[in-house]
Protein backbone atom coordinates (compact mmCIF):
# COMPACT_ATOMS: atom_id res chain seq x y z
CA UNK A 1 0.00 0.00 0.00
CA UNK A 2 1.32 3.43 -0.93
CA UNK A 3 1.70 5.76 2.06
CA UNK A 4 0.85 9.45 1.78
CA UNK A 5 2.98 12.19 3.33
CA UNK A 6 0.13 12.92 5.78
CA UNK A 7 0.47 9.44 7.30
CA UNK A 8 2.02 9.80 10.83
CA UNK A 9 4.53 7.01 10.17
CA UNK A 10 5.69 8.82 7.04
CA UNK A 11 5.94 12.16 8.83
CA UNK A 12 8.11 10.57 11.51
CA UNK A 13 10.61 9.56 8.84
CA UNK A 14 10.62 12.99 7.19
CA UNK A 15 13.15 15.70 7.86
CA UNK A 16 13.84 19.20 6.60
CA UNK A 17 17.30 20.67 6.33
CA UNK A 18 19.58 23.04 4.50
CA UNK A 19 21.44 21.49 1.60
CA UNK A 20 25.22 21.50 1.77
CA UNK A 21 28.09 20.56 -0.55
CA UNK A 22 27.80 16.81 -0.95
CA UNK A 23 24.06 16.93 -1.58
CA UNK A 24 24.44 17.67 -5.28
CA UNK A 25 23.62 14.16 -6.50
CA UNK A 26 20.36 13.79 -4.57
CA UNK A 27 19.29 17.30 -5.63
CA UNK A 28 20.06 16.60 -9.28
CA UNK A 29 18.17 13.29 -9.20
CA UNK A 30 15.09 14.98 -7.75
CA UNK A 31 15.14 17.96 -10.12
CA UNK A 32 15.75 15.75 -13.15
CA UNK A 33 12.42 14.06 -12.39
CA UNK A 34 10.77 17.50 -12.73
CA UNK A 35 13.04 18.71 -15.51
CA UNK A 36 10.74 20.97 -17.51
CA UNK A 37 9.84 23.21 -14.56
CA UNK A 38 13.19 23.12 -12.72
CA UNK A 39 15.59 24.80 -15.13
CA UNK A 40 16.53 27.85 -13.05
CA UNK A 41 17.19 25.98 -9.84
CA UNK A 42 18.84 23.00 -11.55
CA UNK A 43 21.14 25.05 -13.79
CA UNK A 44 22.14 27.36 -10.92
CA UNK A 45 23.02 24.43 -8.65
CA UNK A 46 25.07 22.76 -11.35
CA UNK A 47 26.88 25.99 -12.15
CA UNK A 48 27.53 27.39 -8.66
CA UNK A 49 27.20 24.46 -6.28
CA UNK A 50 25.43 24.50 -2.92
CA UNK A 51 27.62 26.90 -0.95
CA UNK A 52 26.50 30.50 -0.53
CA UNK A 53 28.86 33.48 -0.62
CA UNK A 54 26.58 35.99 -2.37
CA UNK A 55 28.12 35.13 -5.75
CA UNK A 56 26.17 34.98 -9.03
CA UNK A 57 24.04 31.84 -9.48
CA UNK A 58 24.42 30.83 -5.83
CA UNK A 59 21.47 30.20 -3.52
CA UNK A 60 20.57 28.94 -0.07
CA UNK A 61 18.71 25.63 -0.45
CA UNK A 62 16.22 23.98 1.89
CA UNK A 63 14.86 20.52 1.15
CA UNK A 64 12.33 18.11 2.63
CA UNK A 65 13.30 14.42 2.75
CA UNK A 66 11.65 11.12 3.52
CA UNK A 67 14.61 9.03 4.54
CA UNK A 68 17.15 9.58 1.78
CA UNK A 69 14.53 10.54 -0.81
CA UNK A 70 14.04 14.23 -1.56
CA UNK A 71 10.41 15.34 -1.67
CA UNK A 72 10.83 19.04 -2.44
CA UNK A 73 13.28 21.93 -2.49
CA UNK A 74 13.27 25.71 -2.39
CA UNK A 75 16.24 27.96 -3.12
CA UNK A 76 16.66 31.60 -2.13
CA UNK A 77 18.88 32.86 -4.93
CA UNK A 78 21.47 35.63 -4.95
CA UNK A 79 18.97 37.80 -6.86
CA UNK A 80 16.40 37.57 -4.05
CA UNK A 81 14.14 35.20 -5.99
CA UNK A 82 12.74 32.16 -4.19
CA UNK A 83 12.88 29.27 -6.68
CA UNK A 84 10.53 26.36 -6.05
CA UNK A 85 10.25 22.70 -6.91
CA UNK A 86 8.13 21.52 -4.01
CA UNK A 87 5.02 19.63 -5.11
CA UNK A 88 3.74 19.10 -1.56
CA UNK A 89 5.77 21.37 0.72
CA UNK A 90 6.03 24.75 -0.99
CA UNK A 91 4.89 26.88 1.95
CA UNK A 92 7.14 25.19 4.48
CA UNK A 93 10.18 25.17 2.22
CA UNK A 94 9.75 28.80 1.17
CA UNK A 95 9.63 29.89 4.80
CA UNK A 96 12.57 27.71 5.75
CA UNK A 97 14.93 28.70 2.94
CA UNK A 98 14.30 32.40 3.61
CA UNK A 99 14.90 31.86 7.32
CA UNK A 100 18.16 30.11 6.49
CA UNK A 101 19.28 32.81 4.04
CA UNK A 102 18.08 35.97 5.83
CA UNK A 103 18.08 37.61 2.39
CA UNK A 104 15.36 39.98 1.22
CA UNK A 105 12.65 38.32 -0.87
CA UNK A 106 12.36 40.03 -4.26
CA UNK A 107 10.13 37.50 -5.96
CA UNK A 108 9.18 33.87 -6.52
CA UNK A 109 9.34 31.48 -9.46
CA UNK A 110 8.13 27.96 -10.05
CA UNK A 111 5.03 25.92 -10.89
CA UNK A 112 2.03 28.19 -10.45
CA UNK A 113 0.31 26.42 -7.55
CA UNK A 114 3.58 26.28 -5.63
CA UNK A 115 4.21 29.99 -6.14
CA UNK A 116 0.75 30.85 -4.85
CA UNK A 117 1.24 28.66 -1.77
CA UNK A 118 4.70 30.04 -1.03
CA UNK A 119 3.62 33.64 -1.59
CA UNK A 120 0.83 33.27 0.96
CA UNK A 121 3.18 31.59 3.44
CA UNK A 122 5.63 34.50 3.14
CA UNK A 123 2.74 36.97 3.63
CA UNK A 124 3.36 38.59 0.26
CA UNK A 125 -0.14 38.33 -1.22
CA UNK A 126 -0.69 42.07 -0.83
CA UNK A 127 2.86 43.17 -1.63
CA UNK A 128 3.13 45.48 -4.67
CA UNK A 129 4.43 43.71 -7.75
CA UNK A 130 6.07 44.58 -11.03
CA UNK A 131 5.10 41.24 -12.57
CA UNK A 132 2.75 38.48 -11.49
CA UNK A 133 0.56 35.88 -13.11
CA UNK A 134 0.46 32.35 -14.42
CA UNK A 135 2.10 31.54 -17.73
CA UNK A 136 2.05 28.49 -19.99
CA UNK A 137 5.01 26.12 -19.79
CA UNK A 138 6.04 24.75 -23.19
CA UNK A 139 8.48 22.00 -24.16
CA UNK A 140 9.92 20.64 -27.39
CA UNK A 141 11.99 17.60 -28.25
CA UNK A 142 14.57 19.19 -30.52
CA UNK A 143 14.30 16.34 -33.00
CA UNK A 144 10.79 17.68 -33.70
CA UNK A 145 11.84 21.31 -34.29
CA UNK A 146 10.04 22.88 -37.26
CA UNK A 147 12.62 25.08 -38.98
CA UNK A 148 11.17 28.16 -40.74
CA UNK A 149 11.56 28.20 -44.50
CA UNK A 150 13.06 31.72 -44.40
CA UNK A 151 15.91 30.35 -42.30
CA UNK A 152 16.54 27.28 -44.44
CA UNK A 153 16.73 29.29 -47.68
CA UNK A 154 18.93 31.99 -46.15
CA UNK A 155 16.52 34.93 -46.29
CA UNK A 156 17.18 35.28 -42.56
CA UNK A 157 20.68 34.67 -41.21
CA UNK A 158 21.38 34.02 -37.53
CA UNK A 159 24.70 34.11 -35.70
CA UNK A 160 26.36 35.12 -32.44
CA UNK A 161 26.25 38.87 -31.69
CA UNK A 162 29.26 40.96 -32.68
CA UNK A 163 30.86 43.68 -30.53
CA UNK A 164 29.61 46.49 -32.77
CA UNK A 165 26.02 45.31 -32.16
CA UNK A 166 26.24 45.45 -28.38
CA UNK A 167 24.68 48.89 -27.95
CA UNK A 168 21.70 47.95 -30.10
CA UNK A 169 21.20 44.66 -28.31
CA UNK A 170 21.56 46.26 -24.87
CA UNK A 171 18.81 48.70 -25.84
CA UNK A 172 16.68 45.74 -26.88
CA UNK A 173 17.37 43.99 -23.59
CA UNK A 174 16.25 46.93 -21.47
CA UNK A 175 13.18 47.27 -23.70
CA UNK A 176 12.46 43.59 -23.06
CA UNK A 177 12.86 44.06 -19.30
CA UNK A 178 10.51 47.05 -19.30
CA UNK A 179 7.91 45.31 -21.48
CA UNK A 180 8.05 41.84 -19.96
CA UNK A 181 9.47 42.15 -16.44
CA UNK A 182 7.99 45.46 -15.36
CA UNK A 183 11.38 47.15 -15.04
CA UNK A 184 11.83 50.91 -15.17
CA UNK A 185 14.25 52.45 -17.65
CA UNK A 186 16.95 53.73 -15.31
CA UNK A 187 20.76 53.72 -15.23
CA UNK A 188 20.67 50.85 -12.74
CA UNK A 189 18.30 48.74 -14.82
CA UNK A 190 20.32 49.46 -17.96
CA UNK A 191 23.47 48.30 -16.22
CA UNK A 192 21.73 45.16 -15.00
CA UNK A 193 20.29 44.42 -18.45
CA UNK A 194 23.69 44.88 -20.07
CA UNK A 195 25.22 42.52 -17.53
CA UNK A 196 22.69 39.79 -18.30
CA UNK A 197 23.20 40.21 -22.05
CA UNK A 198 26.99 40.23 -21.75
CA UNK A 199 26.88 37.02 -19.70
CA UNK A 200 24.68 35.33 -22.30
CA UNK A 201 27.04 36.39 -25.09
CA UNK A 202 30.16 35.24 -23.22
CA UNK A 203 28.51 31.88 -22.47
CA UNK A 204 27.51 31.44 -26.12
CA UNK A 205 23.83 31.66 -25.26
CA UNK A 206 22.69 34.56 -27.47
CA UNK A 207 21.89 34.73 -31.19
CA UNK A 208 20.93 37.65 -33.39
CA UNK A 209 18.80 37.29 -36.53
CA UNK A 210 19.63 39.51 -39.50
CA UNK A 211 17.54 40.53 -42.48
CA UNK A 212 19.45 42.23 -45.28
CA UNK A 213 22.45 42.48 -42.92
CA UNK A 214 20.50 44.39 -40.24
CA UNK A 215 19.74 42.93 -36.77
CA UNK A 216 16.01 42.22 -36.48
CA UNK A 217 15.57 39.84 -33.53
CA UNK A 218 17.38 38.36 -30.54
CA UNK A 219 17.12 34.86 -29.09
CA UNK A 220 18.80 33.72 -25.89
CA UNK A 221 18.87 31.02 -23.24
CA UNK A 222 18.48 31.97 -19.58
CA UNK A 223 19.31 28.50 -18.25
CA UNK A 224 21.21 25.63 -19.84
CA UNK A 225 22.13 22.04 -19.07
CA UNK A 226 23.90 19.52 -21.30
CA UNK A 227 20.59 17.95 -22.37
CA UNK A 228 18.06 20.78 -22.07
CA UNK A 229 17.91 24.54 -22.60
CA UNK A 230 15.45 27.20 -21.50
CA UNK A 231 14.63 30.12 -23.76
CA UNK A 232 14.41 33.58 -22.24
CA UNK A 233 14.97 37.16 -23.37
CA UNK A 234 13.50 36.73 -26.86
CA UNK A 235 12.98 40.19 -28.34
CA UNK A 236 11.99 41.79 -31.62
CA UNK A 237 11.54 45.59 -31.83
CA UNK A 238 7.83 46.51 -32.18
CA UNK A 239 8.25 47.91 -35.70
CA UNK A 240 9.68 44.58 -36.89
CA UNK A 241 7.15 42.23 -35.33
CA UNK A 242 4.78 39.99 -37.25
CA UNK A 243 7.32 39.11 -39.94
CA UNK A 244 8.63 35.80 -38.58
CA UNK A 245 11.97 37.18 -37.39
CA UNK A 246 11.63 35.88 -33.82
CA UNK A 247 10.66 32.46 -35.10
CA UNK A 248 13.87 32.32 -37.15
CA UNK A 249 16.02 33.57 -34.27
CA UNK A 250 14.60 31.01 -31.87
CA UNK A 251 14.91 28.18 -34.40
CA UNK A 252 18.55 29.05 -35.08
CA UNK A 253 19.37 29.07 -31.37
CA UNK A 254 17.70 25.68 -30.95
CA UNK A 255 19.57 24.23 -33.92
CA UNK A 256 22.79 25.38 -32.26
CA UNK A 257 21.73 23.79 -28.97
CA UNK A 258 20.95 20.55 -30.78
CA UNK A 259 24.39 20.56 -32.38
CA UNK A 260 25.90 20.92 -28.88
CA UNK A 261 24.04 17.81 -27.71
CA UNK A 262 20.84 19.16 -26.18
CA UNK A 263 17.71 17.14 -26.90
CA UNK A 264 14.98 19.30 -25.35
CA UNK A 265 13.99 22.93 -24.91
CA UNK A 266 11.52 24.61 -22.57
CA UNK A 267 10.09 28.09 -22.09
CA UNK A 268 7.19 29.84 -20.41
CA UNK A 269 5.12 32.74 -21.68
CA UNK A 270 1.74 34.36 -21.31
CA UNK A 271 1.98 36.42 -24.49
CA UNK A 272 -0.52 35.23 -27.15
CA UNK A 273 1.71 36.32 -30.05
CA UNK A 274 4.67 34.48 -28.53
CA UNK A 275 2.49 31.40 -28.04
CA UNK A 276 1.76 31.32 -31.78
CA UNK A 277 5.47 31.67 -32.56
CA UNK A 278 6.48 28.78 -30.32
CA UNK A 279 3.66 26.48 -31.38
CA UNK A 280 4.67 27.04 -35.01
CA UNK A 281 8.14 25.75 -34.10
CA UNK A 282 6.64 22.58 -32.60
CA UNK A 283 6.43 23.48 -28.90
CA UNK A 284 3.60 21.86 -26.92
CA UNK A 285 2.01 22.90 -23.64
CA UNK A 286 3.23 20.75 -20.75
CA UNK A 287 2.15 22.70 -17.66
CA UNK A 288 2.18 26.11 -16.07
CA UNK A 289 4.76 28.38 -14.52
CA UNK A 290 4.57 31.57 -12.52
CA UNK A 291 6.94 34.42 -11.78
CA UNK A 292 6.17 37.09 -9.19
CA UNK A 293 8.55 40.05 -9.09
CA UNK A 294 8.08 42.47 -6.21
CA UNK A 295 8.52 46.21 -6.54
Question: Predicted segment positions?
Answer:
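Acyl-donor-binding surface of acyltransferase catalytic domains
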Residues: 2-5, 66-70, 77-154, 292
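A short beta-loop-alpha structural element at the N-terminal edge
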Residues: 11-29, 111, 157-171
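Conserved donor-binding loop and adjoining core beta-sheet/short helix segment
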Residues: 15-19, 29, 35, 43-107, ...
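Conserved GNAT-fold acetyl-CoA-binding loop/helix
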Residues: 31-48, 177-195
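A conserved beta-strand-loop-helix scaffold within acyl/acetyltransferase catalytic domains
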Residues: 46, 76-78, 184-234
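Conserved acetyl-CoA-binding loop-helix of GNAT-fold acetyltransferases
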Residues: 89-96, 232-238, 242-259, 276, ...
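Conserved GNAT acetyl-CoA-binding A-motif
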Residues: 102-112, 257-270
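Conserved active-site alpha-helix within GNAT-family acetyltransferase domains
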Residues: 113-130, 247, 271-288
Amino acid sequence: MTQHVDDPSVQAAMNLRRLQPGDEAVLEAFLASHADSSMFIRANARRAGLSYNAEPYQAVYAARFHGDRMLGVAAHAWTGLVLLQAPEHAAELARTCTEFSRLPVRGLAGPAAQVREARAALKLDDAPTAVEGDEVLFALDLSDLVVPEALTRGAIVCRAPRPEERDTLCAWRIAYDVETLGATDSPESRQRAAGFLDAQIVDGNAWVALHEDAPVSLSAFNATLPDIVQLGGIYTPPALRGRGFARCAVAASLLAARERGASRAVLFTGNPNAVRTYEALGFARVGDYSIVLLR
